[in-house]
A protein has these predicted regions:
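Cys/His-coordinated zinc-binding microdomains
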Residues: 12-20, 70, 97, 139
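Short metal-coordination and nucleic-acid-contact micro-motifs, chiefly zinc-binding Cys/His arrays
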Residues: 4-12, 62, 89, 131
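Hydrophobic alpha-helical transmembrane segments
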Residues: 57-70
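General N-terminal leader/first-domain-start detector
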Residues: 1-25, 44
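Short cysteine-rich clusters marking metal-coordination/redox-active sites
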Residues: 11-13, 66, 93, 135
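Primarily the internal scaffold of c-type cytochrome electron-transfer domains
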Residues: 20-54, 78-91, 99-295, 334
């Protein structure tokens, strides 16, 4: 008989994850501070009602198109739900850590290692490739018709920054954050948008610039990735299939083997891409999309530096780059290139001294 699917309340006893202190307060952190605990509530707002009307959805709170991400327990066979478990709890424990199995009874035991938990069936979220695959499904992959209503934003998956913003219910404050998490996330994001285009699951006008900007970003960062052309000649099935494969392999490799010296190297290389933003070097929309991804990358790579090593003036210049990148559709590539040069100059020897 299949194990019952547990709700968050089943994990909230004081002897498990509902106690006090850093080691057992995970339920309190999730329920009081984490937006995932309120994901179902988003389906009951007036904004959701307008979106539902545009999509001819009678009730977003039970529509498979909505609950798959906002209330994953609604997708579980009701016969398998434990007593009192309701989809309204949103994105809860089992949504990320895996459905109940052999790992449930022993995962809080002090004599169990992380490897023991994983071998028993708990999802290995310490592995950045596994984590990226878990998160990207709802933090990037979204029905283009939903975005087309004008009431739901197009999502940008950036694993490092989004993990940093997450209220921490894990013990190691530095686990799974930094340049490695950023890079793995971007490679997975490229794989997913390319797969969606290949399989007709994305709206090309929105998604081709995203795929191009991610491919460009990974290529310019310098970690052994050959830029895959996206455009009239390179956006066909063969090119997309190749990108899906390459990006997936790149994400796996970066998750399993990482040289810390890559972060300053990538920061230096990406800050030196001003020539790509000379007016006319690429179509205007392409440059705007690349700028949007670039400033996010510079932010994460700069944040990965020890605070005392961050050059004075770099943060202020980065703020100006964010402002310029967010000026679509009035993006000014010349102004962006000029400010990018200032940012590169502010980095100076602190970064150029890297390998």
């Amino acid at each position: 008989m299949a194990a019952e699917t547990l709700g968050a309340a089943d994990c909230s006893t004081s002897g498990c994850h509902g106690g006090a202190g850093d080691k057992s307060s995970q339920f309190v952190t999730w329920s009081q501070h984490d937006v995932h605990a309120r994901s179902f509530a988003a389906l009951t707002t007036s904004r959701s009602a307008r979106m539902s009307e545009a999509l001819s959805i009678t009730d977003a709170s039970v529509s498979p198109r909505c609950v798959v991400c906002h209330a994953p327990l609604a997708t579980v066979d009701p016969a398998l739900l434990g007593a009192g478990v309701e989809p309204s709890e949103g994105v809860s424990c089992v949504s990320c850590h895996n459905l109940p199995g052999g790992w449930i009874r022993g995962h809080t035991r002090s004599d169990w290692t992380h490897a023991d938990r994983v071998s028993a069936g708990m999802r290995d979220l310490n592995d950045l490739y596994t984590r990226a695959n878990t998160c990207v499904a709802c933090h990037q992959n979204i029905d283009p018709e939903i975005v087309g209503t004008g009431h739901h934003p197009a999502l940008v998956f950036e694993m490092d920054g989004q993990t940093q913003d997450e209220p921490r219910h894990w013990r190691d404050p530095a686990a799974g954050i930094g340049a490695q998490a950023w890079f793995v996330g971007q490679a997975v994001a490229l794989r997913e948008v390319s797969w969606a285009l290949l399989n007709g699951r994305a709206e090309p006008a929105r998604s081709v610039p995203v795929a191009d900007s991610l491919s460009w970003l990974l290529d310019r960062s310098g970690l052994d990735f050959k830029e895959q052309p996206f455009g009239e000649a390179g956006n066909g099935p063969d090119a997309l299939a190749s990108t899906v494969e390459k990006a997936d392999l790149l994400a796996k490799r970066a998750a399993r083997s990482w040289d810390p010296s890559f972060a300053p190297t990538a920061l230096r290389r990406l800050s030196s891409t001003g020539a790509d933003f000379i007016p006319g070097a690429s179509p205007h929309l392409v440059q705007a999309s690349r700028a949007d991804r670039l400033v996010l990358a510079l932010d994460r790579l700069l944040s990965a530096m020890p605070a005392p090593s961050r050059p004075a003036g770099a943060s202020q210049s980065l703020d100006r780059l964010f402002h310029l990148a967010q000026s679509q559709p009035d993006f000014d590539p010349a102004a962006f290139a000029k400010e990018l040069s200032r940012f590169s100059g502010a980095l100076g020897v602190s970064v150029s001294a890297g390998p």
